Structure formats: structure tokens, C-alpha cells
Design a protein with these regions (language model features):
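A short, charged/proline- and glycine-enriched loop
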Residues: 1-5, 33, 190, 213-214
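Active-site beta3 strand of CheY-like receiver
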Residues: 35-39
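Conserved PLP-enzyme active-site core in the AAT-like
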Residues: 7-10, 22-30, 41-58, 64-72, ...
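A short, Lys/Arg-enriched amphipathic alpha-helix followed by its capping loop at the start of a domain
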Residues: 15-23
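Generic structural signal for well-ordered, non-membrane alpha-helical segments
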Residues: 89, 104, 108, 112, ...
């Protein structure tokens, strides 16, 4: 399935009418978020310096019409040069399509790319879901309204996990695994797992993997209720609660500074589990709500420096954030950018 258009300069539009089934638009008719290549001729070289084009890394293709024109100053920003004088239009458009297809493949994440290609193949479905790509809904006025509201592709892409071409979601292989590996790379994680039912279920997966009855959990009062369910109810861990600030308007702030003091934490542990109070790492797991509902964002580096040596694990619940590493002023808040030593 082809998602991107091709932007043509005014002079090129008179020479090229279509490219391998892709929509062609003028360079001044797009914001370049839907474009897979910009095609200009050697008389339009000023467009090479367009910041919108360069910011997305969109390929620039130059059609050579005048061999005497010097384009050396622009070569480092040009993806491909096509000698139109010595090529047919069909060969030219084939070269353009190769460039667009490569760019499209580079920007689409693995699973979405595979899913859209699979949908584009228009395979017949003999498994679930039973609406058959949305066609079943067309048998009733209510269903037709439902179908028309969401549009065709959402139903055609509603596929059974038995469609093995897309990979197995349960044993992590194929395109499903490729997507997880891609997400890990993007987020600077060692591994990434996709979990259904949102962060509530993801939290329970982590907590049930790490905690057993009697383990000490250092518990942020701002934690989501799924932390209570997974850590306290299901796993049976013993909580050490950390106090949080609260203003006269009821807004909940961050954990109070003294709660990160080692002697204070060991004192609280002694009250619940005296035999663990003097252990090197008395805390099995600390759970910190990295970004709170009220807008408090913790600096992960500071948290780890304060209590990391007391804990086997620190779990940052990032349900309200997660994008801090991509925002320069918030990078220091990201747990996934930390350089960690043996302690």
C-alpha cells in the first residue's frame, strides 16, 4: 500500500503526469508530511534549501535538463540526479518510485508497514473477525452508519492473530517481534513488550514478576491503583508509604524530600520488617509515579542517586508521560537515558 505522494516543481509537472500510481502534487500545495520525494529540475535548485523538506529528510531528486548548469554546490543535499535528456519518461518515473518506496519503508514502523501491505493485498478472510473487513455491517442501516463513521481501513485492518504473516503476538516473532525491537531502539530500552489492556495490565505484569509475599515495596502515594492491585493485593508485598506534598487546593505534589533519606527509609522498614532493616538492599522494589496526574515530573537520575543502592529494582510508572527523553528540557527526567553502574 502506497501512503506518500510525490511533490513536483512547476516545471516538472509539465513533463511528468503520474508516478507508479502515486498522487502528484505541486511543491507549494503540501506541508511535506505526506510526501515521499520532491522532484525538481536543475532550474529549481533554490528549493533544495527549503527547511521543511530538509527537516523531514525527504529525498530530493533533480532532473537534469541543462548539462552545462553547475549543481555541485547542492550535491550534498540531493538524493538522486536523473539525466532526463538520456532517459525515457517511464524509466525516469521508475527511478523516482524506487526512491519514494525506500523513503517510505524507512519512516514506517515495522508492524504498521506490514499491516498496511497485508491490507493492500486484499486477502480473503476465513477466520475471525466475522464482519469480513466491514462488509457484514453494510447489511443493515445501523451497521452502515457505523462503518461510514470509522472508514474502510479500520475494518480491513481488523485481523485475527491467526494471520501468521504478521507474526505471532504470543511468542514474539515475525513483524510483531520486529515492532517490539523497533520500539526498544526508539526508546533506548533493552527490551520492549507490547501488552494489551494498557498500563494497568503492564504494571501488574511487572509487579507479579518481581514481588512475593513479605517483600518490601517502597510505595509512592501518587501511584495508580493498578500498583495497589498488583503489588499489594495480588503479590502480597509489604508497603512502605512515602508522603507527598499537598497544597490548599487539593493538588498532590511530589514526594517530600526527607522520604528519600536512607536513615528515614531504614527506620520505616524496621517498623514493618525488623529483620530487613539493616540489609544492604532492604527494598525489593520502589515504585515511583514518574509523571503524576497533577503534573509533577521526577528527575530519574536524582531518584536513582538517592535510593538506588537500597533497592533491588526501581519501577518508574510513566503512564502520564513517557516522551520526556525526546524533549530536550526534560531529558534528565528519563529513566531510559540513565547510565547505570553496578550499584
Amino acid at each position: 500500500m502506497k501512503h506518500l505522494k510525490v511533490a513536483l516543481s512547476d516545471s516538472v509537472q509539465s513533463k511528468i503526469k503520474s508516478i507508479a500510481g502515486r498522487t502528484c502534487v505541486g511543491v507549494f500545495e503540501t506541508d511535506f508530511t505526506d510526501v515521499g520525494a520532491v522532484v525538481i529540475d536543475d532550474g529549481d535548485l533554490d528549493l533544495v534549501n527549503n527547511n521543511q523538506i530538509s527537516s523531514f529528510g525527504i529525498p530530493i531528486i533533480v532532473l537534469r535538463l541543462d548539462a552545462s548548469r553547475d549543481i555541485s554546490l547542492y550535491e550534498n543535499r540531493i538524493t538522486s540526479i536523473i539525466e532526463l535528456l538520456s532517459m525515457s519518461i517511464d524509466d525516469c518515473t521508475s527511478e523516482i518510485e524506487k526512491v519514494v518506496a525506500n523513503y517510505e519503508a524507512s519512516i514506517l514502523p515495522p508492524f504498521f508497514r506490514a499491516l498496511s501491505d497485508y491490507v493492500g493485498d486484499e486477502n480473503s478472510q476465513f477466520d475471525c473477525p466475522g464482519h469480513q473487513g466491514g462488509q457484514f455491517f453494510y447489511k443493515h442501516p445501523t451497521g452502515r452508519a457505523f462503518y461510514n463513521f470509522f472508514g474502510e481501513n479500520i475494518f480491513r485492518a481488523d485481523l485475527c492473530n491467526a494471520d501468521v504473516k504478521l507474526g505471532d503476538l504470543l511468542i514474539h516473532e515475525g513483524y510483531a517481534y520486529d515492532a517490539q525491537a523497533h520500539a526498544a531502539k526508539v526508546y533506548n530500552a533493552d527490551k520492549t513488550y507490547f501488552v494489551l489492556n494498557g498500563t494497568s495490565s503492564a504494571n501488574k505484569v511487572v509487579l507479579n514478576a518481581l514481588l512475593t509475599p513479605g517483600d518490601i515495596i517502597l510505595y509512592d502515594r501518587n501511584n495508580h491503583k493498578s500498583i495497589c492491585h498488583g503489588g499489594l493485593v495480588m503479590s502480597g508485598a509489604t508497603p512502605i508509604y512515602l508522603e507527598t506534598a499537598r497544597n490548599p487546593f487539593g493538588s498532590i505534589g511530589g514526594i517530600l524530600d526527607h522520604c528519600f533519606d536512607e536513615s528515614y527509609i531504614r527506620q520505616l522498614v524496621a517498623e514493618k520488617s525488623p529483620e530487613k532493616a539493616n540489609a544492604k538492599r532492604p527494598i525489593r522494589l520502589a515504585v515511583i509515579q514518574l509523571g503524576t496526574y497533577d503534573g509533577t515530573i521526577y528527575n530519574a537520575r536524582q531518584v536513582v542517586d538517592k535510593i538506588g543502592h537500597l533497592c533491588d529494582y526501581i519501577f518508574f510508572d510513566s503512564a502520564w508521560v513517557g516522551y520526556e527523553q525526546f524533549i530536550p528540557m526534560m531529558k534528565d527526567c528519563s529513566p531510559l537515558l540513565l547510565e547505570l553502574g553496578p550499584n
